[in-house]
Amino acid sequence: TTTTGFSSTQYQNWPICSQMILFILSFIGGCAGSAGGGPKVIRIAVIFKLGGTSIRKRLHPNAVTRIKIGGDSLSSDTVSSIAGFIGLYLVTFAVGCFLISLTGKDLITVCSSCILTLGNIGIGLGGIGMDFSFSIYPDWAMWIFSFLMLVGRLELFTVFALFTRDFWRS
């Protein structure tokens, strides 16, 4: 499945484990610089390295650790910004899922719909797969999906900055 929703195979007929892998990959998104949505592979790599560094700091509290990508050390501000982005992405996904769950659809359909729109990807599971559409949702849910698509495509910090007082003051 592509970011345009074009699909070349009936992935909904695949085993559940394979569908789960697709769902997890939906959270990763494309590579840096790609048109695909999601947090991007580089941010996920930094988060995994941050997790490893945190474990090492627990074992060796006095150790000085650095997170490196491609041989270059990342500043603590950069790592903090990436962690904040991932946290905000997950909170946005969770709030979207909660709001869409009010439609009464099943959990797989709700979660798949939210990550599909937030990540701007084409993989829909449950009631919105290849043979189904978003017409199963009421009109108010479409507004939430539209917001998730906008946030996912324009980047979280950019859109949420519009809702801060500081943005409008300066």
Predicted regions and their residues:
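Membrane-proximal intracellular helices of multi-pass ion channels
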Residues: 1-170
